[in-house]
């Protein structure tokens, strides 16, 4: 139970029935200055019922309030401020962390499911830096949802359908080499695709051939289907290398193609509700009442569109997983598409749409410009991660040349630096990409938090921590750490409610800072009766830092 809750219960005993415990708890604040105590309750809402000025009410409550949890209660104007007993609270919090370990701040299972659609690269195209944000934000949102007690289904809605596959088939049959594709699938398929477009400038009939092959694929032709499946399988193997580096897993790889046989039903439903209208030969759903442009369902030639497929996917996911929430971690430029999608689902009478959220994010910039190409070529995410690992290895060799598992640590630090940097600020902001600054061991970086955790683990080894409990402390530096550890459950809840991983990034930075301040002022390893208790505090910090980083998709090496 939180201390806000405990304070609310103590206040309730004095206030009586004017406010419920929940209402009291919602009003409790944290004073801006330490001198004003740990928690504050404003009395304005009681003025009408008590027919007194809030200042007088605060004085009355302060005089009556007593609990072993508080060392001091004072009225400060219209506020009742309490000072928590550092000894009681610190023992309770740190020993709870030590007992629950990585389960600290984990909610009980809710038996409710959240579906998150994220990453979703296009088959036969490079996995570029452009896919980093959706992948790491979606992964963190899922980990945080699990911590909050939800079952989670991560969906990689692959771009595995479309006329480009017809073109690719023509290119492969004319100029392709099976061995070359197997050796380097994405680069080879991209080369063939680019070559097709070059040739089509002088041979426009190639476009017709491409359309014909895609038609064969749509009609279930065996050769076309086999080629498509092969392109998809080879691409996925390549993508998997990146997912393995990032430690990202999915429960479903159902991409666009999966919904081919499910779109007809959507069109029938729209027709049955008289929602389809003709517009310049195409079929659309009018969203005039919602002040949105019409949603295109079928093109002139009868081909279904992106929106039709997403409608089919949303309905399928609800019918399959019975989700309470569905997140789409997709760039901000798709905002209109999702407004239209949710509006059409609402018109179809689906109330599950209330739990659907577009989770947008900003761009990755380099020197202020969109980072998608380097010297005219696409920046591959795998290349960037490998470069980060190499740079991390160089930093580690300089700092700790004798480190036993240096390669493994370099991978954790290099990849962790890239992921942490992406999740450090609110996701809606653009991020400036600079590998050297994000790999620094000081400042607001992943390596700073990882290094703090490694330093704490080193103290535990040097001090031979024996698993003893924490016996209490009332100095300011210990208290700074304790209040941070106490905040973790609240941080977990807030990060989930806002679908905002940066709340956890900020938290682990603040906890690392509080610990480094403690480490700088308290002689942790001094051989006296309190040593094992001090190490218990250090152990609690390592547990929470490691878990906080894990939720972001960042590993925490014990040595660096």
From Swiss-Prot:
GO biological process: arginyl-tRNA aminoacylation
Domain of life of the source: Bacteria
Molecular functions per Gene Ontology: arginine-tRNA ligase activity; ATP binding
Cross-referenced Pfam families: Arg_tRNA_synt_N (PF03485), DALR_1 (PF05746), tRNA-synt_1d (PF00750)
UniProt entry tagged with the keyword Signal: no
Motif placement: 'HIGH' region: 121-131
UniProt keyword terms in alphabetical order: Aminoacyl-tRNA synthetase, ATP-binding, Cytoplasm, Ligase, Nucleotide-binding, Protein biosynthesis
Record field: catalytic activity: tRNA(Arg) + L-arginine + ATP = L-arginyl-tRNA(Arg) + AMP + diphosphate
SMART domains: Arg_tRNA_synt_N (SM01016), DALR_1 (SM00836)
EC number: 6.1.1.19
UniProt xrefs under InterPro entries: Arg-tRNA-ligase, Arg-tRNA-synth_N, Arg-tRNA-synth_N_sf, ArgRS_core, DALR_anticod-bd, Rossmann-like_a/b/a_fold, tRNAsynth_Ia_anticodon-bd
GO cellular component entries: cytoplasm
HAMAP family tied to this protein: Arg_tRNA_synth (MF_00123)
Entry-linked PANTHER family: ARGININE--TRNA LIGASE, CYTOPLASMIC, ARGINYL-TRNA SYNTHETASE
Self-association state and partner proteins as the record states: Monomer.
Protein's recorded name: Arginine--tRNA ligase
Organism: Exiguobacterium sp. (strain ATCC BAA-1283 / AT1b)
